[in-house]
Amino acid sequence: MKIRPLHDRVVVRRLEEERTTAGWIVIPDSATEKPMRGEIIAIGAGKILDNGDVRAFVVKVGDVVLFGKYSGTEVKVAGQELVVMREDDIMGVIEK
């Protein structure tokens, strides 16, 4: 099963954060917060402007992005935990 977002929404799969500190101390799952970066796996058609035009996305599928702690809505599709959010909720793209 796939999810196809509508309009100016994107679907993001969270990327796991490092769970070991510089001193090789392993941080348990219960002490970590959900990561605030992820990979875009699907995008909608674009934002519909007031004049009816559609503005294309700045981001693309495959981009690794940063987003806010409370951004979007968490959904579970085909056993994967995903986040559906508006493009405006994305703070930046991590360049490789």
UniProtKB/Swiss-Prot annotation:
Predominant cellular place of this UniProt entry's protein: cytoplasm
Chain's role: Together with the chaperonin GroEL, plays an essential role in assisting protein folding. The GroEL-GroES system forms a nano-cage that allows encapsulation of the non-native substrate proteins and provides a physical environment optimized to promote and accelerate protein folding. GroES binds to the apical surface of the GroEL ring, thereby capping the opening of the GroEL channel.
Subunit (UniProt): Heptamer of 7 subunits arranged in a ring. Interacts with the chaperonin GroEL.
Region forming the signal peptide: none
Biological processes, Gene Ontology terms: chaperone cofactor-dependent protein refolding
Any GO CC annotation of this UniProt entry: cytoplasm
Pfam family, one: Cpn10
Presence of the UniProt keyword Metal-binding in the record: no
Highest taxon listed in the record's lineage: Bacteria
Organism the protein comes from: Legionella jeonii
Protein name per the record: Co-chaperonin GroES
Subcellular location: Cytoplasm
Family membership: Belongs to the GroES chaperonin family.
Keywords carried by this UniProt record: Chaperone, Cytoplasm
Gene designation: groES
InterPro entries the UniProt entry points to: Chaperonin_GroES, Chaperonin_GroES_sf, Chaprnonin_Cpn10_CS, GroES-like_sf
